[in-house]
């Protein structure tokens, strides 16, 4: 391989890396915009106490909080929310969503 071929390979590699970096930045920007839209909707449809509870849940269970947020946003977009969600209503929603834990009673026989 000559110097020209190596330079061309390096140039192509640099272009690929730049394109990949730009694509990643675009993806991050889209995610940030989507998150901002979700937060905007939540501010419109939830009382401050309910948002605070959801933020507290996000600290311990981020995937679960994201799922709850998506459900609330879909309820708001479908027009099924007639008033702001209060803390008590959020609690009720959470009890419906949280999967029931199976309890195991282990008894020693013998």
From Swiss-Prot:
Disulfide bonds: none annotated. The keyword Repeat does not apply. The keyword DNA-binding applies. Keywords: DNA-binding. One of its GO terms (molecular function) is DNA binding. Pfam families: dsDNA_bind. GO terms for cellular component: cytosol. It comes from the Archaea. NCBIfam families: PRK04239.1. Belongs to the PDCD5 family. This is DNA-binding protein Mlab_1482. It comes from Methanocorpusculum labreanum (strain ATCC 43576 / DSM 4855 / Z).
């Amino acid at each position: 391989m000559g110097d020209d071929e190596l330079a061309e390979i390096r140039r192509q590699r640099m272009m690929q890396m730049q394109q990949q970096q730009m694509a990643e930045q675009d993806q991050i920007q889209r995610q940030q915009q989507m998150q901002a839209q979700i937060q905007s909707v939540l501010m419109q449809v939830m009382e401050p106490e309910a948002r605070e509870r959801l933020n507290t849940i996000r600290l311990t269970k981020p995937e679960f909080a994201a799922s709850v947020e998506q459900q609330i946003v879909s309820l708001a977009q479908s027009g099924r929310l007639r008033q702001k969600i209060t803390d008590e209503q959020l609690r009720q929603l959470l009890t419906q969503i949280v999967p029931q834990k199976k309890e195991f009673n282990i008894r020693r026989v013998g």
